[in-house]
Amino acid sequence: MEPERLRRRLGSAFRVRGLLLRAEAVKYLTETLESLNEEEFEDVIDKIIDAVEKQPLSTNMIELSTVEAAVQECSQALDETIKNVFNIIGAFDIPRYIYNPDRKRFVPLSMTNLPVPNLFGTARDKAELFRERYSILQQRTHRHELFTPAAVVIHPDDNRSKFQLKTVETLLGNTAKVREVIVLGMITQLKEGKYFLEDPTGVVQLDLSKAQFHSGLYTESCFVLAEGWYEDEVFHVNAFGFPPTEPSATTRAFYGNINFFGGPSSASVKASAKLKQLEDENEDAMFVFLSDVWLDQAEVLEKLHTMFSGYSSAPPTCFFFCGNFSSAPYGKNQIQSLKGSLKALADIICEYPSIHKSSRFVFVPGPEDPGPGSVLPRPPLAENITQEFRQLVPFSVFTTNPCRVQYCTQEIIIFREDLVNKMCRNCVRFPSSSMDIPNHFVKTILSQGHLTPLPLYVSPVYWAYDYALRVYPVPDMLVIADKYDPFTVTNTDCLCINPGSFPRSGFSFKVFYPSNKTVEDSKLQGL
């Protein structure tokens, strides 16, 4: 590209993002990028600007050193290696991004005045937890076509189908009756038997006597779009709906190639053509998901024998074993018993050399496995329990609950929790169609952008690590390992599966094929 035209394009691209380039920075970029054609330039400049915005900027005037660091980061990102193909990411290793409403961008924690996360959170962490959940849903809702006013209104009726979000504060400031208003807020029960709607600006009492509930599980502490009218300090709700979901591609089109997911790659793996090609070519890749793998039960070990025997001729890429790993609740002998059970599993795996050499094994702890209580995220099983197994089966990973899996360009979240029953028990109003619970459940999780949209006394969370439970941007696959009946549901381009409880569901499990994104139901009953 001609230097003069390149300079103009550079200035324009940075100005669109609200940034200005110093003369020496323009000169450096012109020399670096002059060999690129038009299409390559568009792709590369977006990555460079994304890398610039990740750095702590005190002003919108971009210096040479900032640009040099961004170009260097992009060069490293392009140098993809085999380590980016398959990664298990623990909950405590996920990067934290905070939404900045002024810049309308997500910025890394290092660019904010918030402290580094700590298990023993402060009161500020608890307040920040709900504020961050709210701000993520608010920016997503504002961007939805129903809430985006047309740039040019040709006819007054054009904007009638558009909605405008109000805050609780605007309701409380009115002495007259306010008709037809929509508010985004969190359902809370500040007084027993009375529900309120809360947002960062205030709290208003709700009258739900005439409220219609759209599909989903409306629990306390979940965020809703409430439509109704306000009078005498009470918001009379006509209808409740969830904030609209947003496909991952839409989110990334707006925020660029930020790696929200975690892993070794500096940019999102979604942008990698090399990894996408590897993913398409490797048609034999296969992931096997099992939950409630009770290793202390002889029948379970026998069925695992049968499963390994069946897969020995074509070993899966990875087996994902979710807890609980013991049928008995936590007790004084459980740790010793679990060590022995894992040793028995390792011996079975060693009987099948092809699986032992080729397959990986990932273990996600369950709510009743040994650990520091029921607070999420849960750390992995203790090293002294798993040491012998890891020596016998080197390709094994004991990870957190929840955890994330990055395979080529695909992003998978795995969560072991009996969540369906918990959410049904804590519904403000139970859905009329109880036959369709899996669809209600999946819609709720993806709309909330969070794995546990429940009160903290029902599902406790380490306040400063609440971001590790986010489901935003929407992953390619969400595995909720629950004792509820197995299901497979697709929503917002996300495949959501529950393998069910292995011993309780006739030894059923799920098999996922990443190359064509299909899920197969499998069962060992009667074999």
Swiss-Prot record:
Compartments, as annotated in UniProt: Nucleus
A Pfam family of this chain: Dpoe2NT
Keywords: DNA replication, DNA-binding, Nucleus
GO molecular-function terms, A-Z: DNA binding
A biological process term (GO) from this entry: error-prone translesion synthesis
InterPro entries in UniProt: DNA_pol_a/d/e_bsu (IPR007185), DNA_pol_e_bsu_N (IPR024639), POLE2 (IPR016266)
Keyword Nucleus attached: yes
Entry keyword annotation includes DNA-binding: yes
Main location: nucleus
Domain of life of the source: Eukaryota
One GO CC term, this protein: epsilon DNA polymerase complex
Quaternary structure (record): Component of the DNA polymerase epsilon complex consisting of four subunits: the catalytic subunit POLE and the accessory subunits POLE2, POLE3 and POLE4.
Extra remark beyond the main annotation: In eukaryotes there are five DNA polymerases: alpha, beta, gamma, delta, and epsilon which are responsible for different reactions of DNA synthesis.
Function of the molecule: Accessory component of the DNA polymerase epsilon complex. Participates in DNA repair and in chromosomal DNA replication.
Similarity-based family: Belongs to the DNA polymerase epsilon subunit B family.
Name used for this protein in its record: DNA polymerase epsilon subunit 2
The species this protein was found in: Gallus gallus
